[in-house]
Amino acid sequence: MSPKTVFSTDTHREPIPPQPHPSGARPPQLPRELIPRHVAIVMDGNGRWAKQRGLPRTEGHKAGESSLFDVIEGALELGVPYLSAYAFSTENWKRSPDEVRFLMGFNRDVIRRRRDELHARGVRVRWAGRPGRLWKSVIKELTEAEELTKHNTKLTLQFCVNYGGRAEIADAAAALARDVAAGRLSPNRVTEATLARYLYHPDIPDVDLFIRSSGEQRLSNFLLWQSSYAEFVFLDTLWPDFDRRHFWQACEIYARRDRRYGGAEPNPVGPPQSAAGAQGQD
């Protein structure tokens, strides 16, 4: 591991510009209206990457860290405002105890090690997921990163740890039901937009582009509500081999899609408000 770079935590300084890719590759020149506002990524293929090299699965997870942070640089270069990364799902508890322990410590250490770097780049960190079962040290690092970066506006990175799409919808429904039971909300006034306000981060807009690496073609319970009108791009590249050039490739594919939202003609405005839920800037 290379020595840690020390970044200033001065919130009044201009963010450090993204670092160019070593290959010299530049982001595609897309019209602003064709740049996805919110990109969700399932970072898949770490285990297979390690197996191909005769390495333990944990080495694949370690190698995937640099891929995520190169993609973050690419999102900053392209001007994508929101990026969601699936770091640990509610189903990942089914893995071996050794791998779960590694992933808990690894997620904690990545946030701790990279927090100042993200802050210096103008990235705002948001955590989405259930606190139950998570190590307290993981929660501590995530909440401290959220506090440090809360005023940043270049990119919002939603770090999904102990997250499940069904769990989020169930938690939202339970919170809504409590408000109905307490008389704060009439059941006759509940709409899709009402439920959307109870999601973990209702201010983060719905997913425009959903990317999955490794060639697998499934959602794996990730941002189910928010991805109802997303465009899906599945790339064969294993996650540790993935970088911003693959991210840009997916964004170019997205830009060529006609988004109809159930209508007969392409609709640049977006889905009906009742389906989209509560969307808005931070």
From Swiss-Prot:
Species of the source: Thermobifida fusca (strain YX)
EC number(s) stated in the UniProt entry for this protein: 2.5.1.88
Keyword tags: Magnesium, Metal-binding, Transferase
PANTHER family attached to this UniProt entry: DEHYDRODOLICHYL DIPHOSPHATE SYNTHASE 2, DEHYDRODOLICHYL DIPHOSPHATE SYNTHASE FAMILY MEMBER
Region annotation Disordered: where it falls in the sequence: 1-30, 262-282
Co-factor: note: Binds 2 magnesium ions per subunit.
Binding site for substrate: 45-49, 57, 61, 89-91, 93, 95, 212, 218-220
Biological process (GO), any one: polyprenol biosynthetic process
Cofactor: Mg(2+)
Entry protein name: Trans,polycis-polyprenyl diphosphate synthase ((2Z,6E)-farnesyl diphosphate specific)
